[in-house]
Amino acid sequence: MLLDENPGTLIHHTIGNFNIQPDKQAVTRINDSLSTLQQSRELRMREAESSLRKLSRHLHSLNAQHEEAVAAHDSSKHAADMVELDTKKFRIAKAATELEIESERLESELEMLKERLADLEAQGLEGDEATRRERELDDATILRLKIYRSLGVDIEADDAGNFNKAVIRNSRKGDVHVVNIDPKFSRFFYSNYFWSTMQG
């Protein structure tokens, strides 16, 4: 046979190079983040509603005390109660404003996460078109390099990633030939040269 390894085995190894696990994990993390964010938002809203109810009850109690103070015609106590009521009202208004701002921020963050999730779902587990093309190109290159290596040819790349050197081993003779690949010669020329060197 021309190949040292069974083609089916080579193809099986090539399939193993496809890795969609990071994309699946990213989708899972986003879903978990959305769920956690929703739970956190609901908890904050419940806490805020509980706090507002407590403050409302307290305000009602203070209003009752204020009415009693007015009925008793105690002007000094009345003035003090009014100051306290104004302070409580200010705190309640401030707390309500902060809760509203936080709610808007959480809603905005939730929308961003939903958009991100929609983008990932639209791309699918294989990623977007550019990612798929790059992976397919890399997989084809890896397959070719494995085939060359099985034939006794190691292709070496320079710092720029260009394959410009081939090391050809003739196992029958124990020879090793190093060939610098020049773009001015055709692929057909190098194919014939490699083949004759391996068979020579």
Swiss-Prot record:
GO molecular function, one term: microtubule binding
Disulfide links within the chain: none
GO biological process: cell division; sister chromatid biorientation
Keyword Kinase found: no
InterPro entries assigned to the protein according to its UniProt record, in alphabetical order: Ndc80_Spc24, Spc24_Fungi_globular_sf
Alphabetical list of CDD domains matching this protein: RWD_Spc24
Domain of life, per lineage: Eukaryota
Coiled-coil ranges per UniProt: 42-129
Cell compartments where the protein resides: Nucleus; Chromosome, Centromere, Kinetochore; Cytoplasm, Cytoskeleton, Microtubule organizing center, Spindle pole body
One cellular component (GO) term of this entry: Ndc80 complex
Keywords: Cell cycle, Cell division, Centromere, Chromosome, Coiled coil, Cytoplasm, Cytoskeleton, Kinetochore, Mitosis, Nucleus
Subunit structure: Component of the NDC80 complex, which consists of ndc80, nuf2, spc24 and spc25.
Function as written in the Swiss-Prot or TrEMBL entry: Acts as a component of the essential kinetochore-associated NDC80 complex, which is required for chromosome segregation and spindle checkpoint activity.
Entry's family note: Belongs to the SPC24 family.
Name the UniProt record assigns to this protein: Probable kinetochore protein spc24
